[in-house]
Swiss-Prot record:
SUPFAM superfamilies: Metallo-dependent phosphatases (SSF56300). Binds 2 manganese ions per subunit. The keyword Hydrolase applies. InterPro entries: Calcineurin-like_PHP_ApaH, Metallo-depent_PP-like, PP1_catalytic_subunit, Ser/Thr-sp_prot-phosphatase, STPPase_N. Keywords: Hydrolase, Manganese, Metal-binding, Protein phosphatase. Mn(2+) 2 binds at residues 89, 121, 170, 245. It catalyses: O-phospho-L-seryl-[protein] + H2O = L-seryl-[protein] + phosphate; O-phospho-L-threonyl-[protein] + H2O = L-threonyl-[protein] + phosphate. This is Serine/threonine-protein phosphatase PP1 isozyme 3.
């Protein structure tokens, strides 16, 4: 995909930041398919366990809240001003999943070594068929386009290691994970199964009152206790697990004596939660700081 075409798409997508939130950007079907194909090729050329370097800014779930994504870029810097790692769940639930995923894929194509996208559990056909993305694709384009996204999502990497010390994924730990090479060796393209390592990396959750491994209220995967986080970090000589997947009131929340952090980047999620959104900045010394985007009814004030 030529650079000029990608630049035109990015320009179209970000010019609405001066408009009222919610204004649609109508790319052509051909442009979107090119984004899917070109980004898919890049995902497959890069490892399933990405190795990225600080400084980098990390973001959790976006869920089609496109105007919030643009505001997060305004505060953190539009690429290439900063390096970014997104932890998945770009689509479903929000009203502008297409704009959200298209801008992220376009940035991935333009800055493949500085802009990273991990897979969330909603980047899977069996989930986004139900929770809104399929319907949005069908309403604005057609089912065939949704299938192009499925082919792309099936190739997304599932975890990232920042300077060999911070392990990032969408969901959490797995009882099946004994070596990081297991992540590197997971097959792609693939759908997300209902059990096993890939499922857990996408869908497990920390549990404050859990010791070891517990049942998950979601009906899939596990919960894990602080003991499992400490054990995992010690075994693999890591400092922190960084994940998303759960709404947290302040946009970020520590667990297990600050050995794990949950980041959620969709403020006022679905218009139903009075939560803030957050972005974690990791500096060259691996010090983590958080930028908070308050919910809309609190005038979207951005604070450090």
């Amino acid at each position: 995909m030529d650079t000029a075409a990608v630049d035109r798409i990015i320009e179209k997508l970000i010019e609405v930041r001066s408009s009222n939130p919610g204004k649609l950007v109508q790319l052509s079907e051909s442009e979107i398919k090119q984004l899917c194909v070109a980004s898919r090729d890049i995902f497959l050329k890069q490892p399933n366990l990405l190795e990225s370097e600080a400084p980098i800014k990390t973001r959790g779930d976006i869920h089609g809240q496109y105007s919030d994504l643009l505001r997060l870029f305004e505060y953190g810097g539009f690429p290439p001003e900063a390096n970014y790692l997104f932890l998945g769940d770009y689509v479903d639930r929000g009203r502008q999943s297409l704009e959200t995923i298209c801008l992220l894929l376009a940035y991935k194509i333009k800055y493949p070594e500085n802009f990273f996208l991990l897979r969330g559990n909603h980047e899977c056909a069996s989930i986004n068929r139900i929770y809104g993305f399929y319907d949005e694709c069908k309403r604005r384009f057609n089912v065939k386009l949704w299938k192009s996204f499925t082919d792309c999502f099936n190739c997304l990497p599932v975890a990232a290691l920042i300077d060999e010390k911070i392990l990032c994924m969408h969901g959490g730990l797995s009882p099946d994970l004994s070596s990081l090479d297991q992540i590197r060796n997971l097959p792609r393209p693939t759908a997300i199964p209902d059990t096993g390592l890939l499922c857990d990396l996408q869908r497990s959750d920390p549990g404050k009152d859990v010791k070891g491994w517990g049942m998950n209220d979601r009906g899939v995967s596990y919960t894990f206790g602080p003991d499992k986080v400490s054990e995992f970090l010690s075994k693999h000589d890591l400092d922190l697990v960084c994940r998303a997947h759960q709404v947290v009131e302040d946009g970020y929340e520590f667990f297990a004596e600050s050995e794990l952090v949950t980041i959620f980047s969709a403020p006022n999620y679905c218009g139903e939660f009075d939560n803030a959104g957050a972005m974690m900045s990791v500096d060259e010394n691996l010090l983590c700081s958080f930028q908070i985007l308050k919910p809309a009814e609190k005038k979207n004030k951005f604070v450090m």
